[in-house]
Swiss-Prot record:
InterPro entries: L-lactate/malate_DH (IPR001557), Lactate/malate_DH_C (IPR022383), Lactate/malate_DH_N (IPR001236), Lactate_DH/Glyco_Ohase_4_C (IPR015955), Malate_DH_AS (IPR001252), Malate_DH_type2 (IPR010945), NAD(P)-bd_dom_sf (IPR036291). The gene is mdh. Keywords: NAD, Oxidoreductase, Tricarboxylic acid cycle. Catalyzes the reversible oxidation of malate to oxaloacetate. Substrate binds at R92, R98, N131, R162. Pfam families: Ldh_1_C, Ldh_1_N. GO terms for biological process: malate metabolic process; tricarboxylic acid cycle. It comes from Halorhodospira halophila (strain DSM 244 / SL1). Its EC number is 1.1.1.37. This is Malate dehydrogenase. It catalyses: (S)-malate + NAD(+) = oxaloacetate + NADH + H(+). CDD domains: MDH_chloroplast-like. The active site is at H187 (proton acceptor).
Amino acid sequence: MKAPVRVAVTGAAGQIGYSLLFRIAAGEMLGKDQPVTLQLLEIPQAQEALQGTVMELEDCAFPLVDGIIATDSAEEAFRDADYVLLVGAKPRGPGMERKDLLEANAAIFSAQGQALNAVAKRDVKVLAVGNPANTNALITQRNAPDLDPRNFTAMTRLDHNRALAQLSNKVGCHSTEIRGLAVWGNHSATQYPDISHCTIQGRPAADQVEHAWVKDTFIPTVQQRGAAIIKARGASSAASAASAAIDHMRDWALGTPEGEWTSMAVPSDGSYGIEAGLIYSFPVTCRGGDYKIVSGLSVDDFSRARMDQTAAELAEERDAVAHLLP
C-alpha cells in the first residue's frame, strides 16, 4: 500500500462537499490503492454540521481513509496538503452585483492563498470549484507567490461533461464515443463549448449536427445549464459538480487516456492569443501529474469571437479585484 496523501477540502459541510467526500474516501479520485488523510475546512458556524459529516465518514469504515481532520483553521487544513479542493465560497445573495460577489470572495481566497503559501506541500495541486471559480483561482494563486503558478486551476470539467451529455443526447451515442470536445474560457455564461475538433464514433461532429443547432441550442444550453438546474431542483448542482471535481483531479493526478484531452481552466501561457496569466479553460492533456495545453488547433472566426468574448470577461473580473491582488 502506498503512503497516505493529504487531501484538503474547503466548504466541507456543504452540499458539494457532502457529494464529494465519500467518493474521495472510496478511492474514486486518486485510485483504489491510494490511502488519504482528509483535512476538512469549514467556517466556525458550520463546525457542528461538519462533525456530522465526519461521523458519517467514520461510519463508512473506508479502508483508504488514514485519518480525518476537521477544523476552522486554513493553516491546519492545508498543512502539508498534496491536493486542495477549494469548494467553499460566498454565494450570490439577492440584489448582489457580480462585483460585490467578486470582492466578497476575494477576501476569502486571498486568505486561503496565503495559508497555502505558508503550509502546503510545494507541489500541491489546487482546484477552485467555488464561484467565480476562474477568478477565485487567480486570487489564490497571486497570494501564494512561493508556489508554482501552474499549481492553481479552476473547474470547467462540469461544463465539459454537460457539453458531452448534450451532444450524446442529440446524436444518440454514448458520451464515451465523443472525442475532441473543448470548453474555452470562463466558468460562466460566456464559456464556449466547442465541437469544431470533435469526432463522434470517429466521424466529425460537424457533419452530424447542424451548425444552427450548435449556435442556437447547444452552446446556450451548456452555458445556462446551471441556472436550469437551480430552477428545476430549487438548489444549485451539487452532485454533478462534485463528480466533475473528481474527474478533474483524477485526470490531473493519474493522466488523461491516451489520445484524449479534457478541459481545465489553467494559467494561460499565451496560447491561442489568450492573455498570459488569465485562468482560462483550454483543452489539455495530463501526464505524470502535469497538464499541457493542446497546441496547434485551428480557430475559425466563429470560435475566435467566442474565445475572445470570454477572455474579455475574465480580464474584467481580474481588473475588478486588481486593488485586492498583491
